[in-house]
Amino acid sequence: MFNYKILEDEMENLKNEGLYINIRTLESPQGAWIVVNGKRVLNLCSNNYLGFASDERLKQAAKKAIDEWGVGPGAVRTIAGTMKIHEELEKALAEFKGADATIFLQSGFIANQAAIPTVFGDENDAIISDELNHASIIDGVRLSKAKRYVYKHNDMNELEARLKEARDVQKARRILIITDGVFSMDGDIAPLPEIVELAEKYEAAVMVDDAHGEGVLGRGGRGIVDHFGLHGRVDMEIGTLSKAFGVLGGYIAGKETLIRYLKQKARPFLFSTGLTPADVAACLEAVKILQESDERVKRLWDNANYFKSEMKKLGFDLGVSQTPITPVMLYDAKVASQFSRELFEEGIFAQSIGYPTVPKGKARIRVMISAVHTKEDLDFALDKFEKVGKKFAII
């Protein structure tokens, strides 16, 4: 029989290092204020950027879809599981992103696992990845037989060196550069124009994971490619519907030929049932709302700019963030964990982030601002951060 003491010992080590994850339970819908473990707290750690997770229009769309389509697709999409509503969402996403076509999958994590090994899976291929790319990209690369290269975060000189190595030393058949658009832990933005220039110079493809750019960057939240005006120059965009869109699911956007190929070859698409009609309908409604107005996106940025400005005035270190993602840098994992618990007692739900999510010695409280926060909410948060920050001698 398996010796489970090995697992217990490892978890005990995590506790001793302040890295053990305590999962809190929500007892209310997502919103600016939520009930967690029986306590009403200000929510500063969800990815619900635009407040869509509890939006009435999305809820009504989901309910209507259940009545019209049932609760599940009943099969994988290549057999009998593609409903008209799935295709409607794929078309709407393509229009929203300014792409030829999209393929809709179960999550953004799965979208990366579908895209990378399917298109760049040969041992003669080369994949060059930013060192701070998301875990789903790392796992997607691991599924490929391609030779792997990693470049220092946002370092274009090192990226070019890896491109030269792949082209001139490895003699790679095909080269793929992968980057997050917005890096989820630090909130900084990839230098996508420079990456695209290097890709074109070395005849490489570019893939960007836009999970934290959609609903945040670009016209009406269309993402990082739109933000930089790079339509037609990025080969694959990976998106998620679980953050700014407030629901669930992921997709790949790109040329029509690429999407048709993925529908023939991508294993997560071929061998796993698609999302429920309710999820798809809610996603479709979120896209419609963003196409109608950019009011929520503007409110998100107003809130983020105000909060970050005031936090800096208090003396907090917010790292290199360029987006509403606000890392409050505390560096020590135990301090970050204790800081988070103290905030919770004060009515603030803001989780600590430590290794392995971020490097050792880079622990933080990651604050996620939303369009549904009011100025009063943010002032409440600022007051509590100041109180706890002084208690821990951080400020």
From Swiss-Prot:
Enzyme Commission code: 2.3.1.47
Modified sites of kind N6-(pyridoxal phosphate)lysine: 243
Enzyme class, broadest EC rank: transferase
Cross-referenced InterPro entries: Aminotrans_II_pyridoxalP_BS, Aminotransferase_I/II_large, AON_synthase_class-II, AONS_Archaea/Firmicutes, AONS_Archaea/Proteobacteria, PyrdxlP-dep_Trfase, PyrdxlP-dep_Trfase_major, PyrdxlP-dep_Trfase_small
Names of required cofactors: pyridoxal 5'-phosphate
UniProt xrefs under SUPFAM superfamilies: PLP-dependent transferases
Residues that, per the record, bind pyridoxal 5'-phosphate: 108-109, 184, 209-212, 240-243
Entry similarity comment: Belongs to the class-II pyridoxal-phosphate-dependent aminotransferase family. BioF subfamily.
Described purpose of this protein according to its UniProt entry: Catalyzes the decarboxylative condensation of pimeloyl-[acyl-carrier protein] and L-alanine to produce 8-amino-7-oxononanoate (AON), [acyl-carrier protein], and carbon dioxide.
Official protein name in the record: 8-amino-7-oxononanoate synthase
Naturally occurring in which organism (per UniProt): Fervidobacterium nodosum (strain ATCC 35602 / DSM 5306 / Rt17-B1)
